[in-house]
Each structure stands twice: as structure tokens, then as C-alpha cells.
Amino acid sequence: MKLKQNIEKEIIKINNIRIHQYTVLYTSNCTIDVYTKEGSNTYLRNELIFLERGINISVRLQKKKSTVNPFIAIRLSSDTLRRLKDALMIIYGISKVDACSCPNWSKGIIVADADDSVLDTFKSIDHNDDSRITSDLIYLISKIENNRKIIESIYISAVSFFSDKVRNTIEKDLSKRWTLAIIADEFNVSEITIRKRLESEYITFNQILMQSRMSKAALLLLDNSYQISQISNMIGFSSTSYFIRLFVKHFGITPKQFLTYFKSQ
């Protein structure tokens, strides 16, 4: 029974994750099963994974050590991503990438050929030093053989869409009671125009709003600096119980389960 409980503590399944920021993820203490609508892949411990912005995944994580965080992740802001893309285009002499002509490799998930030297380079990056993050990532990518796919994925992820502009507006103040009418006023266009432009990108305003709130909630839980009731208010929900129900519906687990799993001891 104790062995079963320990195994359950080391495993978690999280549904409906949308990657809003280009992410470099090091599986330092876990294996990850990643599920998309096309299928699934398993990524082993000590792998370096590049996740394109905009992909939707569900994951099953299994820790090696239950008291240690499962992975280390670097998430790039839109400004950092643009700077990185521009620098890589110059360094590698690439003028343009045609997203339509790119091979559909693992649906936006790329595993790097990462030896110990590459992994050590990743570990040495200071995630909080914005002044160095671009140069550090350029150096990291330069050490990876066959890095063309990574560079192309960065280029593709740096492309901005109208839905990104709507999301960025919402994320400036997630506590605000956003409506389609307010967004239309922000952009000085009609609600119908907003709706049609989002429909052309196969997404709705309500989907963007919910994705933004749930993603922010997950990041705030990972930060481990706030109570669940505080997070609920910060992302626009006055009722904590209602927030918890929505979190469970979205991710398939409770905020407490999420927090407990990712909390280092």
C-alpha cells in the first residue's frame, strides 16, 4: 500500500495545456508522456525539449524523486522571442522561413540532440537575467547539432496573430471583468469584427479569456507565493470555489493537487 501511495505522489496528469510562450524544458527529474490530437510521445529524463508557442497538449509526468520539481523550464516573453529570432536569422544567414513548407515534426515539439555539455550549458542559464537570456540561448542553440528545426520553430513562434493582440490586452489586467464589447472598444472596432477575425484563426474570445486565466493561475501556483484564494482574485474570479471548479474542468486536477506536485520540499 505504501509503495502504491508513493507512486501516486510521483505521477500527475494535466489536461488542456496551451503553450502561450515559447518554452525550453529540461526533464531534470521526470519522464513526460505528451498527448496531442495526433497521438502521443514519451520524453525521458535528462532531455531538452523545445515547445513551440501555440500548441495544445496534455501531459502525464512521473517524477524520479518525489520531493524535487519534475523539470526546469525557460519561458520566453514575446520581446525576448523576437530578439532571439532576429539574432538567429542573422547569425545563420536565414532570411525567411515559410511556415507552410516546414516539415510537420512532432507537431511543434522538438527534442534536441543534447549531450552533457549542452545540458550543462542550459543549467548555467540565469532564467531571471533578461539582459543575458538572449545571448545565453544563442550560445545554447549553437552547441546543438542539427539545430535548424529549432531555429525554424523559433521563427514560426515569433509570428504574431490578431488573437495574440487580444490575449496581450487581456493579460495586462486579468482581474478585469473582460467582455467582447470591452475588447472591441480597446481596438476601436465592432464586436462583429473582433469575432470574425478570431474565427479566421479558429478561436473565440471566450476561449482566449479562459486560456489566459487558467495559464496565469498555473504559473502563479508554480511561483508558490500566493494562496489559492488570492490567485482566484488576481485572475478575475471573486468566488474561490467557482475558480476551483473551472480549474478542475480545464486541467483535470485541483489547484491544490497541482501546487502539491510542483512544490519542492
UniProtKB/Swiss-Prot annotation:
Effect of a null allele: Loss of autoagglutination, hemagglutination and aggregative adherence to human epithelial HEp-2 cells, loss of aggregative adherence fimbria I expression.
Lineage: superkingdom: Bacteria
The UniProt record lists the keyword Metal-binding: no
Domain HTH araC/xylS-type: 164-261
PROSITE patterns found in the cross-reference section: HTH_ARAC_FAMILY_1, HTH_ARAC_FAMILY_2
Keywords associated with the record: Activator, DNA-binding, Plasmid, Transcription, Transcription regulation
DNA-binding region boundaries: 181-202, 228-251
Signal peptide (residue range): none
Keyword Magnesium: no
Record InterPro entries: Homeodomain-like_sf, HTH_AraC, HTH_AraC-typ_CS, Tscrpt_reg_AraC-type_HTH
GO molecular function list: DNA-binding transcription factor activity; sequence-specific DNA binding
Gene3D superfamilies xrefs: Homeodomain-like (1.10.10.60)
Pfam families in the cross-refs: HTH_18 (PF12833)
General remark: Encoded on an unnamed 60MDa plasmid.
Function comment: Transcriptional activator of aggregative adherence fimbria I expression in enteroaggregative E.coli.
Complex and partners: Homodimer.
Name listed for the protein in its UniProt record: Transcriptional activator AggR
Gene: aggR
